[in-house]
A protein has these predicted regions:
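Active-site residues of response regulator receiver
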Residues: 57, 85
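Two-component/phosphorelay signaling modules centered on CheY-like receiver
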Residues: 13-31
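Short amphipathic alpha-helix used as the core "switch/output" element in two-component signaling
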Residues: 41, 66-77
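Receiver (REC) domain active-site loop signature in two-component systems and cognate sites
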Residues: 60
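Alpha4 helix (beta4-alpha4-beta5 surface) of REC/receiver domains from two-component response regulators
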Residues: 67, 88-104, 111, 115
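Conserved acidic carboxylate
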Residues: 10
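Acidic, metal-coordinating helix/loop segments flanking the phosphotransfer/catalytic sites
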Residues: 32-53
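Acidic catalytic/metal-coordinating carboxylates
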Residues: 35-38, 63-67
Length: 120
């Protein structure tokens, strides 16, 4: 286990469960949010730091992943946010990078997410 906390931000409960299963042995604590608004509040409340990771979906009801990433990074510049999405598109990758994401992984490649977390 790596000494980090993971915050999973995903509106689909089954996908949240799948992501949790893939990364569960890599973190000392895992929490979940269903939208970007919850994620911004949870990041501050849990006092997450540079050693921790946020796994953020892009499209969610209410505040989406890009806006939540911008808000978290504005308040916490050291926040490490990895986008986990179904969109394999340069537009989304560029937008995620501009919002402050440090990584971008497709949901179909969750083993790549594990490698990214291990190699942090």
């Amino acid at each position: 286990m790596i000494e980090m906390k993971i915050l999973i931000v995903e509106d689909n409960p089954q996908m949240r469960q799948l992501i949790r299963a893939v990364v569960s042995d890599l973190a000392e604590a895992i929490s979940e949010c269903a939208d970007g608004e919850e994620a911004v509040a949870a990041y501050a409340a849990q006092q997450l730091g540079a050693e921790d990771r946020v796994l953020m979906d892009l499209q969610m009801p209410g505040v989406g992943g890009l806006e939540a990433t911008r808000r978290i990074r504005a308040a916490f510049p050291d926040a490490q946010i990895i986008i986990v999405t179904q969109f394999d598109d340069q537009h989304w990758r560029r937008a995620a990078s501009e919002a402050g994401a440090c990584g971008y992984v497709l949901k179909e490649n969750l083993l790549e997410l594990r490698q990214m977390l291990i190699g942090r």
